[in-house]
Amino acid sequence: MSNLAVKYKQQAQEEVQIQTPPQQMVQPKAKAKITRIEKLLYVAFIGFLLYACVAFIGNKAGLYQVNVEAATIEQKIVQQQKENQELQAEVEKLSRYERIAEVAKKHGLEINANNVKGLK
């Protein structure tokens, strides 16, 4: 019988070993911690990007405003040139010899060829 008791003990030990498989030591992976300096650098970089975006948009808005003003000034220049041409045509029309002679006769003046000087 002692043999049976030994067999029973061996079976119990085998069952215990079967039930509990050998545990592997799982090493937890260490998280890569972000240091304060890295956080500061990330925040500074994001801040710089935001500043660059705002500055870029501001410059574009300023450039648009300057272009609008330039177009307005060009329009005024064209209008002034057209007005100058019309006034120059009127000056040429009013300074014709026939018109001056007619106004002179109307006021009782006579043309004396010796006193006439050409101007240009």
From Swiss-Prot:
Instruction: Output the GO biological process annotations, alphabetical, semicolon-separated.
Output: FtsZ-dependent cytokinesis
- InterPro entries in the record, alphabetically? Cell_div_FtsL, FtsL/DivIC
Question: Where does the UniProt annotation locate this protein?
Answer: Cell membrane
Q: Name one GO cellular component term.
A: cell division site
Taken from the record's topology, the Extracellular segments are: 58-120
**Protein family:** Belongs to the FtsL family.
Q: What does this protein do?
A: Essential cell division protein.
Q: Which residues lie on this side of the membrane: Cytoplasmic?
A: 1-36
- Please tell me whether the keyword Zinc is annotated for this protein: no
State the UniProt keywords alphabetically: Cell cycle, Cell division, Cell membrane, Membrane, Transmembrane, Transmembrane helix
Locate the transmembrane regions by residue number.
Answer: 37-57
Q: Does the keyword Acetylation apply?
A: no
Disulfide-bonded cysteine pairs: these are: none
Q: What is this protein called?
A: Cell division protein FtsL
Query: Which organism is this protein's natural source?
Result: Bacillus anthracis
Tree of life domain: Bacteria
Its record classes its membrane topology as:
Single-pass type II membrane protein
- Tell me the name of the encoding gene: ftsL
